[in-house]
Amino acid sequence: MKFKEFDKPEYFVNRELSWIKFDDRVLSEARDKNLPLFERLKFLSITSSNLDEFYMVRVASLKDQVHAGYKKTDIAGMTAKEQLKAISRQTHDLVHVQYSTLNRSLVPALEKAGLHVIFEHEAFSEKQKEFVDQYFEDNVYPVLTPMAMDSSRPFPLIRNKTLNIGALLSKKDTKKGKEEIDFATVQVPSVLPRVVIIPSEKKGHTTVTLLEQIIERNIDKLFLSYDVICAHPYRIMRNADLPIDEDEAEDLLVEIQKQLKKRQWGEVIRLEVEDRKSTRLNSSHITITYAVFC
């Protein structure tokens, strides 16, 4: 074999796809039943935070290349657009395995260890409903800032990596005699613990739920003059790549500080919504993506 043949694309693996394989290897630690349960949960959370950073930096960089019309292939023979398609396929597979690991392996193991997790507020018992409703009134409601979008109120930008709840609201327009549908959102407050201990129905068990489920159950209290059609959690990733030219920057530290501030408001790279979302809400998200998130 001639030495020059070693530069053939088939001899190389794309850097971004190789990174996804790395994150999958981290995920394999979460599936290892020989490890302590909370260590497995920690590895699962690491794969998720890794994926966030991957999208905000590496995927964002590829999108910038596509927008700039850059069509040169990488060492593995893939253009930026081809890489994005392959990344989408493989990350969907990775996320599927993440949730499969959580729901089929870790959650049952937690249950066996005496920790019951309620992921959907519809599953609350009457006693639990009473508790979370009071918890909402006392602790959550005072720190919420609901925001609705209509013709008179421009929608604010959603902060990077924040967890939010999107809702479709219905209000009958009596003048026009038709129903008006508005989109509203509320950020899940980071000042409160996301995991909330609630009364347990099983003796000797600890039961917990997620803060967003408490808000979702009580979201109608935020929009008293509307009917809430549906409400579901969502999260966005923004472009956090730092395009700094060290040679051109007069003050590198100042330039880095400027770019870090911009990271919260960069172009939207990824939108995450829960699997059981309403198709009507999903269609509304698609329609208003650029108006709301960009």
Predicted regions, residues:
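N-terminal non-catalytic structural scaffold regions of very large proteins
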Residues: 2-280, 284
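Single conserved hydrophobic/aromatic residue that forms the stacking wall/gate
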Residues: 281-294
